[in-house]
Amino acid sequence: MKTLYSLRRFYHVETLFNGTLALAGRDQETTGFAWWAGNARLINLSGKLLGAHVAHAGLIVFWAGAMNLFEVAHFVPEKPMYEQGLILLPHLATLGWGIGPGGEVIDTFPYFVSGVLHLISSAVLGFGGIYHALLGPETLEESFPFFGYVWKDRNKMTTILGIHLILLGVGAFLLVLKALYFGGVYDTWAPGGGDVRKITNLTLSPSVIFGYLLKSPFGGEGWIVSVDDLEDIIGGHVWLGSICIFGGIWHILTKPFAWARRALVWSGEAYLSYSLAALSVCGFIACCFVWFNNTAYPSEFYGPTGPEASQAQAFTFLVRDQRLGANVGSAQGPTGLGKYLMRSPTGEVIFGGETMRFWDLRAPWLEPLRGPNGLDLSRLKKDIQPWQERRSAEYMTHAPLGSLNSVGGVATEINAVNYVSPRSWLSTSHFVLGFFLFVGHLWHAGRARAAAAGFEKGIDRDFEPVLSMTPLN
């Protein structure tokens, strides 16, 4: 069995297996890859690779539309979203669609529209994917040079990179437009317990926006995950969108510098590995963001964060015992520290007990009770409102944790309450996907570097152990 030398010259990786499933131009004889190697067979067939990518986009959008409609069909307005296992409707709610004061759902029709639009879009993408995979030209270079490319063409590759950056920038600005002009977005910090509002006073100060990037990721600093007002989030999208668009234009107009030509591997598999690394980083950041941040991911829709549930429990029992006559300012706990209140390392008054580790928490239901030096004792005695008690009791019993024993002092009740927080799902899934994308990055980067160095040849199939074994049948 012979692999075409002309193809091998540009792609030095041979992975030879039996070529029983023959597809003209996509079989093992002509590509050096068996059917299960998927898109590797299309490395030099830009038209077919386009079909694969468009079809893949169709599958993604189909899932979004179908899952969206599934959630709408099962949605019960009387229960909070996070009690219903929803992962898509909370995103739409955060964007301000169908939501009234306090995060209450007043209209599910926008969610239905979103699902239908995604389904229709997926049909268009699916048709395009099938067309380009089966009927369209195998390669685009001859008939549509603008869409054609050769992997080694560094200038063309950076032009494609530039186009992608511009599209990402446009996406960032879509959120800005929604927040500024098209109905606004949901602000969990709005007075009176959260509401949809238009963002009027954008934060555009570079020292504030880029200050987040310079913060420590630990403790009370929290890097970009610590952002806690929408002005900063939307202003950050203005900066990000602008940088992406200007960077995209720059990459389209310029050619790679000499140091970049030398430092990077310029092959399809190398670009795949770079992309996987970038997506992996995005996954890990998203994991931390959805776990800790209750501004971009409002607790009204996603359920409380872990620290928030723990602090809510301390607050709930402080309220109860204060009513029973306890002096919460001076009561001593079993460790000799304050039972209800204590001081943080920097002197602020914070909740005592196991939840002391979460003293950094900021949440809309708790901030009104703070003074210049942390929790204000007189406010805790006189100013606690019924809505704060209700919300903290609700959050206390809906921690994003499932455990047989106490976790940070939170009542998890995993055997009594059939509840898994969307925060748990979204954090865990993004961590796991981020990890596997990172492994994929290492794999493809190693193969791409080996191919560039010219020493990867795959396994020698002539002396493979399985060939000397008795057939299974």
From Swiss-Prot:
Gene: psbC
Pfam families: PSII
Designated name of the protein: Photosystem II CP43 reaction center protein
Species in which this protein is naturally found: Aethionema grandiflorum
Annotated positions of the Phosphothreonine modification: T15
Keywords of this entry: Acetylation, Chlorophyll, Chloroplast, Chromophore, Manganese, Membrane, Metal-binding, Phosphoprotein, Photosynthesis, Photosystem II, Plastid, Thylakoid, Transmembrane, Transmembrane helix
Gene3D superfamilies to which the protein is assigned, alphabetical: photosystem ii from thermosynechococcus elongatus
GO molecular function ontology, one term from the record: chlorophyll binding
Cofactor note (record): Binds multiple chlorophylls and provides some of the ligands for the Ca-4Mn-5O cluster of the oxygen-evolving complex. It may also provide a ligand for a Cl- that is required for oxygen evolution. PSII binds additional chlorophylls, carotenoids and specific lipids.
Function (record text): One of the components of the core complex of photosystem II (PSII). It binds chlorophyll and helps catalyze the primary light-induced photochemical processes of PSII. PSII is a light-driven water:plastoquinone oxidoreductase, using light energy to abstract electrons from H(2)O, generating O(2) and a proton gradient subsequently used for ATP formation.
Keyword Manganese (UniProt): yes
Record's subcellular location: Plastid, Chloroplast thylakoid membrane
Residue numbers carrying N-acetylthreonine: T15
Assembly with partners or alone: PSII is composed of 1 copy each of membrane proteins PsbA, PsbB, PsbC, PsbD, PsbE, PsbF, PsbH, PsbI, PsbJ, PsbK, PsbL, PsbM, PsbT, PsbX, PsbY, PsbZ, Psb30/Ycf12, at least 3 peripheral proteins of the oxygen-evolving complex and a large number of cofactors. It forms dimeric complexes.
One GO BP: photosynthetic electron transport in photosystem II
NCBIfam families in UniProt: psbC
Propeptide residue span(s): 1-14
Coiled coil ranges: none
Chain sites annotated for binding [CaMn4O5] cluster: E367
Membrane-topology annotation of the record: Multi-pass membrane protein
Main location group: plastid
This protein's GO CC annotations: chloroplast thylakoid membrane; photosystem II
Transmembrane residue ranges: 69-93, 134-155, 178-200, 255-275, 291-312, 447-471
Family: Belongs to the PsbB/PsbC family. PsbC subfamily.
